[in-house]
Amino acid sequence: PSVALTLADDATEKKPDPPRVAMCLPLAINVGETTKVIVRGWHLEGVKELRSSNSHITLKVLSTSKAEVPNGLDVKRVGDTQIEVEATVARDTKPSEVELTVIGPDGDSQPHVILVGSEYPVIADKEANDGFRQAQPVAVPQAIDGVIHDKRNVDVFAFDIDDEQRLLIEVHARRHGSAL
């Protein structure tokens, strides 16, 4: 009796996962400024480059690291690694949604949208504004770039309007990857 034996390389060897982006903080960056952006996601170790769909934006990787999962949030939603990026937006850039792609050693991420500029002046959420007595004054119209620091955080804003004036308040958080 004879036996035939075939040896082959394991064709099912799993390739490393490419980078995946969960969110960028802040969700928006201002025209004509340099802003530090934290890109959170998975498999972001070893990343040395990000690309923008807009040539008026330059992106410089400052560091990559493990990311703590914020209290009460799920790592499957917010990621476990992060990239600190310096984003510089030229003054002549028009407000728009811009796609960022993470270029990693194991492939490229899917594009992630970040807001660039606004048709309204943008201000940052300033603490302490956690109650009506500490409400942060804002103008109308105004775009506010806010951050929820923990699961019980509330941000309160105060503004003046006429009796008959109607307001449209739009929150972009969820559609741009925020854990809010």
Segments and roles (model prediction):
Residues D9, K15-E68, R91, P105, ...:
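Acidic, Ser/Thr/Pro-rich low-complexity intrinsically disordered segments
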Residues K76-V85:
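Aromatic sugar-binding surface patches on proteins
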Residues P121-P137:
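Extracellular carbohydrate-recognition regions
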